[in-house]
């Protein structure tokens, strides 16, 4: 047991790793195809970061081209229709979430297999158009709208995976590092209520449970900055051999919890200094936009979202040197310049009336008042694939299907409400 203790001490000698990394683009897992197109188009025209199609794996190139052709076909069909009868491939109702126990995994092999399967399963009338270079028809080529939309949606999601792969590939080394912040080990232990005392007798555990526990503890080991996969695998193997899984649990669980909490907590450095909290009203200053149409856009969305019970958030309009402000740039992925930052950058190509824009401004304002994202993405070197998931698919800061939750109110109260003396 002394040998195991020494191994643990050597491996766990560094502080827990923070999951935030400012260099990567801020791209939530549920971006729409239109948002990917805007981003890739802007990056290409400015010769930024993103590889050209010729530099990519040809399988990624194929999925992107198929998705682009589908988009052009849908646009041509909708040009002759009303807004009510237009074909929609994306909507709040059809959006897919990626819960922590069913993560999204994508790479050229996975995406190519999906595209091949779709070529086989889609109606021939769709395949004949999308997988060719012929003139695009102005109708659905004889396919009923429901079938066309359902099948088109599958190919559109394949396009999104390919576009995301292309967008994130320039930062693949950073995404490899992000694997150390994978929370699934802690999540498994927490949701299954596994404690150290449950791990004191390795011999009594079923092979199936042992495999799950080993995987979980490997991941909690990786929640320390500087640990390598080989180191953590060695420690896990030693813990099994020496009946030391309980020790490994005790060595890693606090850091794993800290890592988990870092996706939800408003840290001291992210807390704003210009917020007031009086009774049930939290007031945040905001620079008055030059165009008056953006005042109700901001006020209606932000004040509607950030309320809980009798409590509510209010914006205080004015001119503030260090206050939040709204900025629009073409093709930019919406983001804030840091947690507790002041500059909310939105894509000027996206109409503010659309649902995606209305959700985005609510989510981005969450960063202004200090909330981190509670989704995670990394590159799994064993799978050779990107992996992403949302820690809570009902939470505004995790998912486009999410809303303000009680935990967010409690976090705001802890960060900003005056303490009773």
Please provide the spans of the model-predicted regions:
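Extracytoplasmic/secreted envelope proteins and their assembly/folding machinery
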Residues: 295-299, 303, 362, 394, ...
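Sec-exported extracytoplasmic/periplasmic mature domains
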Residues: 303-311, 367-374, 417
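Catalytic Zn2+-binding segment of zinc metalloproteases
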Residues: 359, 365-382
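Post-HExxH zinc-binding segment in Zn-dependent metallohydrolases
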Residues: 381-421
